[in-house]
Amino acid sequence: LGVLLTGAASWVVSGLYRRRMLALMKRSPPPDPAQAVAAARAPAPAKPVATLNALANRRASWRYLFAVSALSLLIGITQSVLALLFVYGAELLSVGRALTLGAVYAWPMALTWGLVRRWSWLRTLGAIGLYLLAMLALTLWRSVSPQPLATSLGWLGGLVLIPVLVTLVIGASGRIRAVAPYLLPIFLMLAASSVLTLQVMASGVQDPPGWVIRLVGAIGVWPAITVMAVAPWLLLAWPAWAIARTLARAYRAKRFSDLWYLLAAYWLVALGASALTALEAVGWMALTQFIPWLWIPLAAWGLRGWLAPHGAPPTLLVLRVFQQDVGVQTLFDRVVERWRLSGNTVLIAGTDLLSRTIDPDDVFTFLNGRLADRFVANEAQVAERLRDFDLAPDPDGRYRVNECYCYDSTWQQALAALVAQADVVLMDLRGFQARNQGCRYELGVLATASHLQRVVLLFDASTDRSTALADL
């Protein structure tokens, strides 16, 4: 229930966010008399020369993948030990059985690979399927007594079905995936309160309170059940909202990264599914299945030094032809996400990359009705916005994507400031034509930026290359 509510709410919020973004981008801010005469632009402070090192990036990528894979195995083995102790029976505990079951329980490792590598959901599901086939072979080989193939398949399928369905609901659609992980704690808490209330009411169905009888008599059975299910929301709405806002503030304070937040959320779902299936058999002892989740914050703290990048980080400016959503999103997944292991990424905000760049702080800024505060209205605000960029690495060693929200009347000032800050520029010119005046202006600015170490232009068959090269 909580997942379905999260998916529905995320669909609505994402659509409203996109609509609000478009409206603000097209709007011109009222003139500010205080900015009628532009102050002289102060020279940018000198920064260390950044080094572009593709080999270091590949090493960081493999180091990161090894870290999250080892973490998944650690969680899986811990879960298997606890399951053998408190769910299946302590007499079954042995080193071999714990390791085998731990490898099976570590199946979210394949989901983590998809998150790190930014695979499509189809490819991620394929990886999960291959992992489960390997685990099927392992369990058949390690089984003390021969088990029918259908029994083993049913057990493995039951282990992953609920978590995979949940992750598909909140992650398969880009529109939902952009917002759902940050609304999930709110709606899980509300849904849990509804389920608990209905269970308490069901336990007293033989002797219900008088007010319940009167409520059913006044509005009917199903409306009464609905009222009792939703009533706890009135009490928990503010605490749930406060918890979500606390998470947003923690993200802003760099307590965790966006990727580790998703990793923690998906592992919580996987462990929760195991706990729910064991709840009826062993009662509250099934909650011990959540204990392995604590390895995630511990690992995030312990791996900070090992995953930390070294040297001065280069800054990548991403420019693109707007309204080419699918293509630029794929480019973001394949290039920018890997670049984040080496340096910062800056860009002018747009709705085309909403599903890739939105973070908890963005979501709750919008829900508080303060999205317009993010937009820069004049050159002074551009400089202020750039000073507020978060250019330090997250605890997992990855750098964040910083966006400059611009009106139609301020994007050129923002572009000049971003180009001055950048070391490298990636400009996606697929679909570019002579009528794309904004891109032509950007090419003209790049032509005069002699400090850039590298400018990469991406073409395809639909690109008007002659116009682009002439402008450059």
Language-model features: locations:
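Membrane-helix interface and helix-disruption motif detector
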Residues: 1, 80-101, 116-122, 138-158, ...
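Hydrophobic cores of alpha-helical transmembrane segments in multi-pass inner/ER membrane proteins
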Residues: 4-11, 100-111, 155-168, 227-241, ...
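Cytoplasmic membrane-interface regions of multi-pass membrane proteins
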Residues: 16-56, 105-127, 161-184, 238-258
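N-terminal topogenic membrane-targeting module
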Residues: 32-48, 257-270, 280-394, 398
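Transmembrane alpha-helical segments of multi-pass membrane proteins
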Residues: 56-73, 121-137, 178-195, 251-272
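Acidic/glycine-enriched connector segments
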Residues: 87, 91-98, 142-149, 365-422
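Glycine-rich, charge-decorated loop segments at or immediately adjacent to ligand/cofactor-binding or catalytic sites
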Residues: 356-363, 458-472
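Conserved TIR/SEFIR loop-to-helix hotspot centered on a Trp-containing motif
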Residues: 432-445
